[in-house]
């Protein structure tokens, strides 16, 4: 099985490195591992479809894509399986790898530029390769609901017997006795006014 980062690598060798150049691609990527949260996710082996446009700009390559995938999970109230269609737009700038500085002034300028950029926010190209993993993962996770429901008016499960409320009668209930008073339940009986 391919590592996650290898599965999302895209070779942009067809795109010339001249500002203003553009290429469009349609991709179907297979996820090597689960992407999502505990209760809902795009499962390993599922396809993620991308309609992608690469634009060459002076700093690097601007990637714009429409992502679509299918997430599987379970309803937080009734635990029924659910499917959720994910449709999300991605736009990221991948910077060209910096050229190695030759002179002292170039090294100083390169250090200042590196200090100005937050390393976590900068996506770098590796030669002609673009790693789409981080933006795809972020787009999917941000589009997933924290508490997925099978329907907005799902009633959930009866806490007493665990059966779905929607399949129970309206009069369904469980007699709950406060454990502090449970010992008195054996004393019950109709009140006898003769004694």
Task: Set out the residue ranges of the language-model regions.
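Structured interface patches
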Residues: 1-195
